[in-house]
Amino acid sequence: MIEFGKIYNENCLETLGRSSESFIDMTITSPPYDDLRDYNGYHFPVEEIAAGLFEKTKEGGVVIWVVGDRTYNGSESLSSFSHAFAFRDAGFRVHDTMIYAKNNPIPSDCGKRYRQAFEYMFCFSKGQPKTFNPLTIPIKQEKAFKSFRITKV
């Protein structure tokens, strides 16, 4: 059984497996991707995790999945999009795709391509999200976003 207010330091599939009901309102995570770090042989099963999160997320709940792509030999892996398709295939709606602009990206000076100074923030929802809180405080880059509008879906 899951105790609310407790932090579990374990494989998320084990944690999800301890509940028989949909109990999650929101998940926010930046999982490991593209073998950029060694996790002692741990393989990250995106499809299993997406399916487990879909099963345990409440109707109207959301998953914010922050992920980027590895650049290898001048080519991006596009694994972030593979993750998005895995969540869609598990049953989630792709509610929003946002860009997280990193303030302090990993330096790269290859001189042949733009530096990847961002990650994708995919917002997956199980049905229509229960809550939407648009930005109401002005941001530094506000002029750049003037052409974007919030629309009802």
Task: Label each region the model flagged.
Residues 1-153:
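Core catalytic lobe of class I
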